[in-house]
Regions:
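One-carbon transfer enzymes
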Residues: 1-201
């Protein structure tokens, strides 16, 4: 299965996925990494793993459709089966031929604490401020709205008394490091089906 990874920052999700592949837990071929930020630290992981990589900046395009094409045409050329978003913060439209072929991981239990502006520390601050007793992560298919597509899988973690955003973020990230590879393994089976908002395998 040929994969592309979209990133914007430090690349911790990309690094985790590469490690799972190298450890034999994922039978995938990372063909391409595309960053929305030419200075993203995560590009070093692509370089170290000898994965083709490039940056495509939204500000270089006058409209959303042109940016969409610039992001996905390299994926078509590389024969990509699925695109994985890992800390990708730039909104991008999903072309019709990539419907249900792009997945993202969000550090909360969608449909709570998600949507535009909910990323990184902000998510965990919101969870704590609301008084939620659980949080977690969600792997979902991506559509044209933020954090909106059908849910592939979720993992739950407790919110502990007197948690800080950093402590909760760490607990959620540990769950993410297992959930995303698990989601990729589900896609590897070829059995995943999407019917409206319902996902089965």
């Amino acid at each position: 299965m040929k994969l592309a990874v979209f990133i914007s920052g430090g690349g911790t999700t990309l690094h985790n996925l590469i490690q799972h592949r190298d450890d034999g837990h994922l039978d995938v071929d990372f063909k391409l990494v595309i960053s929305s930020n030419p200075n993203a630290e995560g590009l070093k992981y692509a370089e170290q793993a000898k994965i083709a990589h490039q940056s495509v900046c939204r500000k270089d395009f006058s409209h959303a459709e042109a940016y969409r094409d610039a992001m996905f045409e390299p994926c078509r050329t590389a024969g990509i089966d699925y695109v994985l978003m890992g800390g990708f913060l730039q909104h991008v439209l999903i072309p019709e031929d990539f419907t249900h072929r792009v997945i993202n991981i969000h550090p909360a239990l969608i449909p709570s604490f998600c949507g535009k502006g909910y990323y990184g520390r902000r998510v965990h601050e919101a969870v704590l401020a609301y008084g939620a007793t659980v949080s977690g992560c969600t792997v979902h298919f991506v559509d044209d709205q933020y954090d909106h597509g059908p849910i592939l899988l979720q993992r739950v973690v407790p919110v502990e008394k007197n948690d800080t955003p950093e402590e909760l973020a760490h607990r959620v990230f540990v769950a993410e490091c297992e959930a995303y590879p698990e989601a990729v393994r589900l896609l590897e089976t070829g059995r995943v089906r999407v019917d409206g908002r319902q996902v089965s395998w």
